[in-house]
Amino acid sequence: MGTPFECGVPIVVFSSQKRAMHTPENMKTHRVDGHTSRLSLESRRLTGQAGQIAQAARALYEKKGVAKTTVKDIAAEAGVTRELVYYYFHGKKEITRAVLDDYIEDLVESAMVWNENREFGKTRQSLRACVQAFRRSLYDAAGNERPMIRVIEELGVRDAFDVRAVRETVNALDACVASEYAQFHKVEIEMVYEMFCVVIFGMVGLVKLNPAITDEELMKVVEQTLHLDMEPIHQDRPL
């Protein structure tokens, strides 16, 4: 009987040693064009044929489920031979880790796209865009959960995935957003990293508890929790 748990060993959420995890030690940042004070992260998404195989597996997992997808199916979807699949991955379990890595990259990338596009000094508008990006990363326009939720729940790794997703998103926000904020605002809280974790975990739970909660209400929760300075900043030089 097909199962996402190979030989009784559950798929773990964390990357294999071949693909280092997002940690402060190995995150690679770059300066955002047009800004002297803003950083963003370099993408860690798999590319080339390995990325093509991971994307094929992801599409099949979301369409037919993990248990019903075979390596043969993945090879056919990717348009490659099974031999090539095994050249890049030891088996289905490692492919599944790559799919989970890709989901994590989606979430981190969503935060970084928001960060790169926000307008300096307009904290309220930036916060609204942040809340909207948060919703889009987990739910579609109709309020339905993204397909990745079904996949991680089938794998039985929802809690571990949530922990990793929050940690890596907060790593990114701490390195690229909090650092810039601190240059131009007084930081009114201690344990900034931990408070970011509280906010993201709290928002995920709050939206599940009350799907009808508005963006304005979520903004107020974030503003009050982080004690954000919402006054606009006017700066003569480009940042």
Roles of regions detected by a PLM:
Residues 112, 158-186, 190-194, 220:
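Amphipathic alpha-helical packing segments from all-alpha helical-bundle domains
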Residues 52, 56, 60-94, 98:
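Helix-turn-helix
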Residues 129, 136-175:
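Short secondary-structure transition hinges
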Residues 6, 10-15, 26, 187-209, ...:
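Hydrophobic alpha-helical segments that form the core
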Residues 1-48, 234-239:
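N-terminal intrinsically disordered/low-complexity leader segments
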Residues 101-108:
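Short, basic, alpha-helical segments at the C-terminal edge of helix-turn-helix-like DNA-binding modules
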Residues 28, 66, 89, 151-159:
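Short helix-capping/turn signature of helix-turn-helix
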Residues 98, 112-143, 196:
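Hydrophobic alpha-helical connector segments
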